[in-house]
Amino acid sequence: MRHLLVVAALLAGAAPAAAQLMPNDQSLVTFNRYIAVRERRVPGFDSPGIPLGSFTLQPTLDANVLYNDNVLATQDDRDGDVIARITPALTANSNWSDSLLSLSAIADIDRYGRLGTENTVNTNLSAYGWHDLSRATRFRSLVRFQSLRESRESQDVFVLTRRPIRFRTLELGVGARHRFANTQVSVDGGVVKSDFDDAVRRSDNILIDQDFRDSVLKRGRARVEFGQSPAVAYFVQGTYDRRTYRLRARDPLASARESEIVEALGGVRFELPILARGEVGVGYTRGSYRGVQFTPVSGLAIRTQVTFFPTQLTNVTVSAERRVSDTGVPSSGGFATLSGSIRVDHELLRQLVLGASAGFRRDSFNGADRDDERFELGASADYRLNRHLSARLNLSRLDLTSSGTGAFKSFVANRLLFGVGVRP
């Protein structure tokens, strides 16, 4: 069941160019010694789903009321509004012994009290599956379609448009893994096609062409794990990305922004009796671009997340990452991100989970004199009334500072959310 929950969470993710195309396959080190607070299945509060033949259906409905004091993420003339957000979702997981098929449909429907131009509907349709050819060999595949609106707070925003920019992505992925005694080899690859709609500038109704962002991303990844014990495994991992743009034949800028990004990592995955589990990966990354105006970006690569369990009711999760990504900003080929965060979750009286988080992120853009620094703070409370009904309260603050001659905007946004969740 825990494996299915992880798959569902990954399939629900939405991003223009996801950092991870395929969900991670099962590692040599499976996390089963400790149970994180938000993973715990509490008797009497866990929804069993609806049996339907060889599938189990998990319909959900989340209804939230959100207040954002800076909806447009502007530096001056901040405009706040109340948003009603409805999120219906349906997941169907097969009950087969040697295979899994997981189908998912999710929609996020936002309706604003005053700023009707911000009303959005985001959809996510996906199908993920795996089949065990033998105890040692597994094949996997993924198909996902998303219709999304770009966040006003995205690092790719370079102009204030009348409505959030709409785009669609189609993702196809395949993967395989094989185990040899205490060694596991896994490979996967995929294609992501992105298509952006044009938008109108908010200040003067001038059409802003977005066709230069239409692209195809091809990704390949290979990973080898060496198991020292059921609780410790060392790994090496390599990832290769190649992005091409639809207008490259007739648009010099689109051709110049075509990129190749490589990443090589080595590290360890563990779940130890010292009350800690996680994965630490360190290595090298390099992004290169066709245009001579965009110099290569290279340096340290980091992908690390470790959870500590000081008590059975408290988790502390620490994350750090450094990577190179492509961007939608026309004056830049891409950007290097350095980020870190800490989150504390505490379970109180079985039904109430309290959380607090803090994070920092720095984006340094290639080809443009621009550095963005984001500081985020958050606090949350999730209350389980029974197996069918839950309630949540979230508070968050984002403080973004953009510097350099190519800086776009600096802003602060505070958000308050109250919501309820319904399960069958």
List PLM regions with ranges.
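Positively charged n-region of N-terminal signal peptides that target proteins for export
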Residues: 1-3
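Cleavable N-terminal signal peptides
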Residues: 6-7, 17
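Short, linear, compositionally biased motifs with a strong N-terminal bias
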Residues: 10-11
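Gram-negative and organellar
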Residues: 20-424
